[in-house]
């Protein structure tokens, strides 16, 4: 099947994350796919996005149901076959050097509650829901925005038997929590709090080209659900052009 990355269940939340995709575009893509013989599609979403509400979670199920309904509205759809729509939901992890680096990550309990609510919103057997383990996402959030003190935590967890942890059968969340406790480190400090806009972060000394001021601007726009056009349409003064010594694009030409 084909995968469509809608990212969020409502247009409001897609605007927050600057995902310039509309339902009309998703519908058009699915319509073409079904007309060409496809009977299964995957819709990719994220859960735990900044400003997210339960209405946005319900929107994930609603979008999938709209795709199911669309299949049966197409006259030249594959005959004799049903449609299968798979919802794949990842847990959002705020990352350094992005506008959402300032955001707190959803707590594990909140993510689990949203996962259960999403399942309750799906009423069709033609819709399947897959979601990422919230525990691994929480750890990813800690190490994504962590500092060098976490090196000891990793070493301690390894000494206690943590390895191949990306494999579900090897992963043990409690082992990691024990390692944090043994090192006297509170993991909540790293991923469950909002970072002040002027805070010196563990990665502030690294220059990736994009300026801190740009990240702040984009973060503030995101909270207002204001989108930013693509770079080839309008320069947002992110600062990356300093790495190449000139303009990033020829703005007199449209890029495909």
Describe each PLM feature range.
Residues 29-32, 72-77, 118, 140-142, ...:
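Generic recognition of flexible, low-complexity loop/linker segments
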Residues 72-78, 117-133:
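Flexible helix-coil linker/hinge segments at domain or subdomain boundaries
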Residues 89-99, 135-143:
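Short, conserved secondary-structure transition motifs
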Residues 1-79, 98-112:
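Conserved non-cysteine loop/helix-boundary elements of the Radical SAM core domain that shape
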Residues 83-93, 241:
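Core structural elements
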């Amino acid at each position: 099947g084909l995968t469509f990355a809608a990212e969020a269940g409502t247009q409001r939340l897609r605007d927050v994350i600057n995902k310039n995709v509309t339902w009309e575009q998703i519908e058009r893509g699915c319509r073409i796919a079904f007309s060409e013989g496809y009977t299964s599609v995957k819709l990719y979403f994220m859960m735990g996005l900044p400003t997210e509400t339960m209405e946005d979670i319900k929107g994930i199920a609603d979008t999938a149901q709209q795709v199911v309904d669309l299949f049966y509205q197409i006259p030249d759809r594959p005959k004799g076959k049903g449609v299968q729509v798979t919802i794949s939901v990842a847990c959002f992890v705020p990352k350094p050097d992005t506008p959402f680096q300032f955001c707190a990550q959803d707590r594990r309990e909140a993510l689990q509650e949203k996962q259960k609510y999403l399942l309750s919103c799906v009423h069709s057997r033609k819709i399947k829901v897959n979601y990422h383990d919230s525990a691994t996402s929480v750890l990813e959030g800690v190490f994504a925005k962590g500092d060098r003190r976490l090196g000891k935590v990793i070493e301690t967890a390894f000494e206690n038997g943590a390895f191949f942890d990306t494999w579900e059968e090897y992963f043990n969340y409690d082992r990691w929590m024990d390692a944090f406790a043994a090192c006297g480190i509170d993991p909540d400090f790293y991923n469950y709090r909002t970072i002040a806009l002027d805070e010196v972060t563990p990665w502030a000394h690294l220059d990736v080209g994009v300026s801190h001021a740009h990240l702040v601007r984009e973060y503030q726009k995101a909270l207002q659900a204001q989108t930013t056009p693509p770079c080839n349409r309008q320069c947002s003064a992110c600062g990356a052009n300093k790495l190449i010594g000139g303009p990033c694009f020829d703005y007199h030409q449209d890029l495909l």
